[in-house]
């Protein structure tokens, strides 16, 4: 169970006070219920991946404006692991969350005209932070740390300025079947086998849609259309160790919104260019941090 108070970044006039209540929305609060699982402490896998854990969570958010923003509920996967062990009972951990948030009050020209940050009832939920984890007893852990959160719909609907918070987190963890020796330094640790480096191949196919702002004169208008986005990544990856791999990727994408234009004197109608102006092919360098069931990917495209 966790409680997270957070500061709302004032990224729009709506959040700064241009709203129905004529006051800035500076603070948000959330409560979370989470369930996770992990390998048995002091095993080989537990030592390699820093006591990594993963699970599912449910969060309820209150931003102080139910009428214009709503009180969304987030459903998400999460994963975390130890960064450093400070004592036998105290560690510094990282954790990230990724999922879907539902129950927003989106922008509407007539019923919710001030809301310039959220354009859809469902939005992506992304959270990451670091925290101290103190093993109080065999059953109970206490956690405290800092965390950042982002909500947006990925340009699938306008407006999409999104909402961002930064704050604290405090929580209590109940462990159902943790061994007694998990709280002390073990007399024996399972040896970690030497890693044999090898080459693997990743193939990713993806598809989505997006909205786009189109230039008309000296300003932009929101195109009334939703545009298809399709693509692939093919990446040979060299596995350097248990937790890190790197390589290059061949990346291709078709973006139906690319180079969309208007014709002066022909209103706000949007036109698509020829197909070759909406295709892209390139290569990127990649590095991945492996976290048991998940990998964290960073890419530098050319």
Residue ranges of model-derived segments:
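Residues on the lipid-exposed face of transmembrane beta-strands in outer-membrane beta-barrel proteins
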Residues: 1, 31-37, 77-83, 96-100, ...
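Transmembrane beta-strands of outer-membrane beta-barrel pores
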Residues: 3-9, 37, 58-64, 98-106, ...
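Repeated loop/turn-to-beta-strand initiation elements of outer-membrane beta-barrel proteins
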Residues: 9, 42-44, 134, 138-142, ...
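Residues that define the transmembrane beta-barrel architecture of outer-membrane proteins
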Residues: 25-31, 69-75, 90, 120-126, ...
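Predominantly the C-terminal beta-signal and adjacent terminal strand-loop region
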Residues: 131-183, 187-196
């Amino acid at each position: 169970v966790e409680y997270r108070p957070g500061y709302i970044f004032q990224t729009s006039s709506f959040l700064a006070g241009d709203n129905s209540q004529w006051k800035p929305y500076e603070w948000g609060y959330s409560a979370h219920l989470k369930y996770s699982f992990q390998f048995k402490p002091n095993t080989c896998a537990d030592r390699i991946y820093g006591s990594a854990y993963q699970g599912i969570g449910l969060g309820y958010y209150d931003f102080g404006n139910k009428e214009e923003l709503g009180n969304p509920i987030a459903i998400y996967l999460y994963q975390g692991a130890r960064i450093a062990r400070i004592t036998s009972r105290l560690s510094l951990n990282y954790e990230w969350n990724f999922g879907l948030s539902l129950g927003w009050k989106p922008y509407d020209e007539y019923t919710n005209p001030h809301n310039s940050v959220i354009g859809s009832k469902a939005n992506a939920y992304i959270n990451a932070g670091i925290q101290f984890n103190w093993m109080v007893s065999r059953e109970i852990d206490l956690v405290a740390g800092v965390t950042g959160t982002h909500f947006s719909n990925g340009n699938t609907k306008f407006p999409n300025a999104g909402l961002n918070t930064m704050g604290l987190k405090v929580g209590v963890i109940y462990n159902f079947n943790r061994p007694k020796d998990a709280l002390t330094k073990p007399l024996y640790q399972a040896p970690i086998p030497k890693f044999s480096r090898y080459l693997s191949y990743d193939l990713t196919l993806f598809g989505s849609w997006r909205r786009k702002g189109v230039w008309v004169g000296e300003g932009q208008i929101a195109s009334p259309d939703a545009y298809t986005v399709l693509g692939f990544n093919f990446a040979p990856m060299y596995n350097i160790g248990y937790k890190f791999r790197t390589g290059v990727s061949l990346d291709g994408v078709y973006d139906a919104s690319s180079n969309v234009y208007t014709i002066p004197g022909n209103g706000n109608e949007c036109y698509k260019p020829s197909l070759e102006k909406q295709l892209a092919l390139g290569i990127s360098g990649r590095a991945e941090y492996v976290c048991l069931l998940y990998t964290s990917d960073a890419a530098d495209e050319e």
